[in-house]
């Protein structure tokens, strides 16, 4: 929609109009409402229209997967395997950190026990 913003009278007696065209578009979907309701930003990205088959057989046969549905399932399987792999690495890192912490504590204790000991009559007093 074009709006006439200004009308200018020129010295020659002609009327000239300057037009301003808006280049930004308003969002058609209320994103704040969708976020508050826990819905995805794009309503076509997830839901029964995208996840369920387009048709079903009346005799109960399974419906073949659509091309995008198959790609989506493969992508989700890749993500799931990556999650399992990374969680395993995280558990390994936690156990390794705990082993290193215990080893450092025992090394510190060993160093303290091997320090110089008192000699002579001080050593004899400690044994009693």
From Swiss-Prot:
Q: Which GO terms describe its cellular component?
A: mitochondrial large ribosomal subunit
What coarse category fits the chief subcellular location reported for this protein?
A: mitochondrion
Tell me the residues of the organelle transit peptide.
1-28
Q: Biological process GO annotation list?
A: mitochondrial translation; translation
- MF terms (GO), sorted A to Z: structural constituent of ribosome
Q: Where in the cell is it found?
A: Mitochondrion
Does the keyword section mention Transmembrane helix?
no
Would the keyword Ribonucleoprotein turn up in this protein's UniProt record? yes
Which keywords fit this entry according to its UniProt record?
Answer: Mitochondrion, Ribonucleoprotein, Ribosomal protein, Transit peptide
Please give the family membership noted in the entry: Belongs to the mitochondrion-specific ribosomal protein mL52 family.
Q: Cite the record's note on assembly.
A: Component of the mitochondrial ribosome large subunit (39S) which comprises a 16S rRNA and about 50 distinct proteins.
Record-given protein name: Large ribosomal subunit protein mL52
Q: Which organism is it from?
A: Drosophila pseudoobscura pseudoobscura
Q: What is the lineage of its organism?
A: Eukaryota, Metazoa, Ecdysozoa, Arthropoda, Hexapoda
């Amino acid at each position: 929609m074009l709006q006439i913003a200004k009308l200018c009278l020129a010295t020659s007696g002609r009327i000239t109009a300057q037009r301003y065209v808006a280049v930004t578009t308003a969002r058609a979907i209320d994103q704040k409402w969708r976020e508050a309701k826990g819905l995805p930003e794009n309503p076509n990205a997830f839901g029964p229209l995208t996840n369920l088959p387009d048709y079903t057989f009346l005799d109960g046969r399974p419906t073949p997967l659509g091309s995008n549905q198959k790609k989506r399932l493969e992508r989700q399987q890749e993500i799931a395997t990556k999650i399992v792999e990374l969680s395993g690495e995280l558990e390994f890192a936690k156990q390794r950190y705990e082993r290193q912490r215990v080893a450092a504590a025992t090394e510190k204790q060993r160093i303290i026990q091997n320090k110089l000991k008192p000699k002579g009559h001080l050593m004899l007093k400690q044994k009693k």
